[in-house]
From Swiss-Prot:
Native organism taxonomy: Bacteria, Pseudomonadati, Pseudomonadota, Gammaproteobacteria, Enterobacterales
Domain PTS EIIA type-2: 6-150
CDD domains referenced in this protein's UniProt entry, alphabetically: PTS_IIA_fru
Pfam families: PTS_EIIA_2 (PF00359)
Molecular function as annotated in GO: kinase activity; protein-phosphocysteine-L-ascorbate-phosphotransferase system transporter activity
Gene name of this polypeptide: ulaC
SUPFAM superfamilies registered for this protein in UniProt: Phoshotransferase/anion transport protein
Cell compartments where the protein resides: Cytoplasm
Main subcellular location of this protein, as a coarse class: cytoplasm
Keywords: Cytoplasm, Kinase, Phosphoprotein, Phosphotransferase system, Transferase, Transport
Induction: Induced by L-ascorbate. Repressed by UlaR.
Protein name per the record: Ascorbate-specific PTS system EIIA component
Phosphohistidine: modified positions: 68
Length: 154
């Protein structure tokens, strides 16, 4: 499942969202996947439990979080949601706070998680200017166009 296709088909982009805590921000992304029938509602609690156990493991770059749980924690099919926050939030990550871009990922197996999910997100942000380009997006179509341009350049 391609990041762009998943976002378009699942209508799972929310821009300039407002959240007061990192937990609320994560829930926005998970709720988009629940609405698209990608994950069960329990996927949200699984992510929170993971943070309790391992810390903010999914904050992977300055300003960028990739919330995800394990396949057996309520994943129905592979999919992504993308959320940008109006106001960046602290996720208690030593190096990469504050966060204002969340790409929530659900993968049906570990292989898909690694090869499909993480690689597509790495490719999107290989050009660091894409962080600010994404922050500037105000419509879902602008996000999809940015991903298209990035894929065409790769």
């Amino acid at each position: 499942m391609k990041l762009r296709d998943s976002l378009a088909e699942n209508n799972s982009i929310r821009l300039q969202a407002e959240a007061n805590t990192w937990q609320e921000a994560v829930k926005i992304g998970v709720d988009l996947l629940v609405a698209a029938d990608v994950v069960e509602p329990r996927y949200y609690q699984a992510i929170l439990d993971g943070v309790e156990q391992f810390g903010p493991y999914f904050v992977i770059a300055p300003g960028l979080a990739m919330p995800h749980g394990r396949p057996e924690e309520g994943v129905k099919k592979t999919g992504f949601s993308l959320v940008t926050l109006k106001k960046p939030l602290e996720f208690n990550h030593e190096d990469n706070d504050p966060v204002d871009i969340l790409i929530t990922m659900a993968a049906v197996d570990a292989n898909t998680h690694q090869e499909v999910g993480i690689m597509q997100i790495v490719n999107l942000f290989e050009d660091e200017a894409n962080f600010d380009r994404l922050r500037a997006c105000r419509t879902a179509q602008e996000v999809l166009d940015l991903i298209d341009r990035t894929n065409a350049a790769a």
